[in-house]
Amino acid sequence: VAEFTFQYAKKTGARVFGGPKFTVSATYEGMFKEELDAAAARHPEVRYQPLLIDATFALLLQTNGEALVIPALNRDGDLLSDFVLQLYGSIAGSESLVLGFDPVTSEVKTVMAEAPHGTAPALQGKNIANPMAMILAGAALLGYIDTSEARQASRAIYEGVFETIHEGKKTPDLGGQMSTIEFTDEVIRRVVSKLEVWSALG
């Protein structure tokens, strides 16, 4: 996990920000901190700002939108992801990935993509749930398939979703009026259009 943190930060041009509460749990969380420090030494080109997890939460409120990769243990990551998504505006605003690594090379070998939010029985049948997380999960999964077609489809989906949001076409949880089906159809329209244009351009 520590090695992937720095590999992903390098790939995305992000800063590694935060870390475990190693002052309380010197063995379990301390081991993770040691692995992060070792990975930082192997990747000196990646900016590294180690912080205790409580300070990470506090300082996130002061960040300026810079890309961050936040290493966290399971419970902390669960809390952190919900917190960040609420800052964005909706817990349905992002995908979640479970990655399996090659034990020797640390390369990603297995990927499972899902929506990080739970079920919402109160929204069932009302056509108002935000489908972003499920759509983005599909885009993320395509991004790990090693073909140009899959990567292009992944890019088209991401762009289609965020362009739709940027133009103010949102579901009610984000302050908009679009239904689940309307939002999904708008994203599909944009994805199809992008893929047709890119195909024509060669």
Residue ranges and their predicted role:
Residues 147-202:
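Internal helix-turn-beta structural module
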Residues 26-36, 61-68, 85, 169-170, ...:
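Short glycine/threonine-rich loop-to-helix capping motif typified by GTGT followed
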Residues 15-22, 139-143, 173-174:
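Short glycine-rich or small-residue beta-strand-to-loop segments that form or flank ligand, phosphate
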